[in-house]
Swiss-Prot record:
It comes from the Eukaryota. This is Putative ataxin-3 homolog. Residues 244-263 form the UIM domain. Its EC number is 3.4.19.12. It comes from Oryza sativa subsp. japonica. Residues 299-327 have a biased composition (Polar residues).
Amino acid sequence: MEEAAAASNGGLLYHEVQEGKLCAVHCVNTTLQGPFFSEFDLSALAVDLDQRERQVMSEGAAGAATTAAGDFLAEGEGSHNVSLGGDFSIQVLQKALEVWDLQVIPLDSPDVGSCLFDPELETAFICHLQDHWFCIRKVNGEWYNFNSLYPAPEHLSKFYLSAFIDTLKGSGWSIFAVRGNFPKECPMATEGSNGFGQWLTPDDARRITSSCNQVQTPTQQAGVSLVADQSEEMSEMDMIAAQQEEADLNAAIAASLMDTGGPFANYAAHEESRSQDAFAIESTSGEMSKDGNLEEQGANKSETSEPNSDNIESASGSNPKQNTTSLEGKESIKED
């Protein structure tokens, strides 16, 4: 398998960046390390598979097989191997790789030999979860993650490869080993035939991956801080509205229980009364806290506005006795 992995292409890596839902196309081409298939090629394979499946189901035996065939054919003319968005089934990927004499084997298959399985001895893996496909491929003796959601292939060390595959399996990913005679070289003239591919040196791939990681890290941190700030901005009115909504919900549940009668009626009435009392207490305490804050603010304002008698006397710069003497002198002058 080591010789099969030695694709030359001048030491370049072939990578395709995600376009729509064509991850299956990208997965097949990065497995082959070249733009060998387009979405139209895989669509043709899907149509052929659909026709064969319908033929097999329509020729099924009587009984359960006929019922299953009826259910299968009743789904209309829609394809069972490609969605309207361009997501292809594993059968389509298998057919595409069979063109190049490659086999797609599930890792949980006895053919893989799970007890003695060593991922470093393989050449390529296909990974699938929900609607996404991507390829892990050995090129020139080094492993790369050719996920089309990445701007460039991500290098994987041999130690990390096993841990990465185990993590994928533990997360529910379906993983398939690809075995056979891989194409050793793809003519560079075919580059851009599907409009998605690019040839990169390992250094270029490493540089692109590093730069993207540096750009994403501050953005992710900003996003986390923004969420935290938004969560702290919940006003008291929002809290009161949430409490009112909870009280209304409890009252509605209690009313439905009372309508049923029986032993639930008394319990429902008690729950309804308790929820209403709880909300009233919370609302009252909220209003009291508001009134207390307003009174405290008013007291602070009154203390600030009241003049200090000592300050007034010192500001006038006069003594009360002196003021009294001056008034008596003025009265005596008037009498004379």
